[in-house]
Amino acid sequence: MPTLKDIRVRIKGVKSTQQVTKAMKMVAAAKLRRAQERAIMARPYARKLKEMLGSLSDKVDTSLNPLLSNRSEVNKVVVILITADRGLCGAFNTNIVKLAYKLIHEDYAAQHSKNGVSLICAGSRGFDFFRKRGYNIIKGYPGVFQRLDFSFAKEIAETVSGMYLRGEADRVVVVYNEFKSVLAPVLKFETLLPITPEASGKDGGSDYIYEPSPESIIDVLVPKHLNTQVWRVMLESNAAEQAARMSAMDSATENAKELLRTLNISYNRARQAAITKELSEIVGGADALKG
């Protein structure tokens, strides 16, 4: 049975941990507000670019742009993995790494068996996991979310588009956590290349007038669309990470509170038992003197 001193030491340790988790929750909440704003603001722009690309694809021969052209065979795959730089965010990193692992070993098992799967890792957790296991990592961006900037998204987009154009990749997919709510990030994977524009349809689509020509505009719009999509998923992942961390630290703080309650009860019981024992010894000693 633990002594009073042992329980006091443990209570002190739990209180210290509770202060840390409470502070981390407040920091994550502050970061979440800004990250959420950035993610939500990026969505309409990315959506509009996608809509314009769909409208243009109805008017031009998409096979003329190699980034819009499907390959007859998919032998080389690039997986862009977006994870966090730090832990203490629940199952955020574990779930996304599991999804990427499943994607590589099930969906692209044939390509993986021939060393045809490569990785680009944004975030330290995914980078460390796959690097230690000997996977082919083309580029790693550990620490990227400490100084998140559009230039990183542009660099990743230019890397994968260059690989696709040179025939070093037949498909590029991105795996990330999409921010939906504080309690429920959504695991997602999307195909970035080849780009598949959504058909606008004959009715209901916007009737744009293009100058100088749809062909010249689509050549400019395609790389811009790719840059924007990579940037959007990075913003979504960052917001989802802060939400997951805030939720995890809130749970940890509540668990510490419950543990303190249990420890205080144990402390009081042990203290009462010690007092009772001392009283019994005093009474026993007094009786012995009388006898």
From Swiss-Prot:
Pfam families found in the cross-reference section: ATP-synt
GO terms classed as biological process: proton motive force-driven plasma membrane ATP synthesis
A single Gene Ontology CC term: plasma membrane
GO molecular function: ATP binding; proton-transporting ATP synthase activity, rotational mechanism
Topology term for the membrane: Peripheral membrane protein
Location in or out of the cell: Cell inner membrane
InterPro entries: ATP_synth_F1_ATPase_gsu (IPR035968), ATP_synth_F1_gsu (IPR000131), ATP_synth_F1_gsu_CS (IPR023632)
NCBIfam families found in the cross-reference section: ATPsyn_F1gamma, PRK13425.1
Protein family: Belongs to the ATPase gamma chain family.
HAMAP family: ATP_synth_gamma_bact (MF_00815)
Subunit relationships: F-type ATPases have 2 components, CF(1) - the catalytic core - and CF(0) - the membrane proton channel. CF(1) has five subunits: alpha(3), beta(3), gamma(1), delta(1), epsilon(1). CF(0) has three main subunits: a, b and c.
Name of the protein: ATP synthase gamma chain
Organism: Chlorobium phaeobacteroides (strain DSM 266 / SMG 266 / 2430)
Name of the encoding gene: atpG
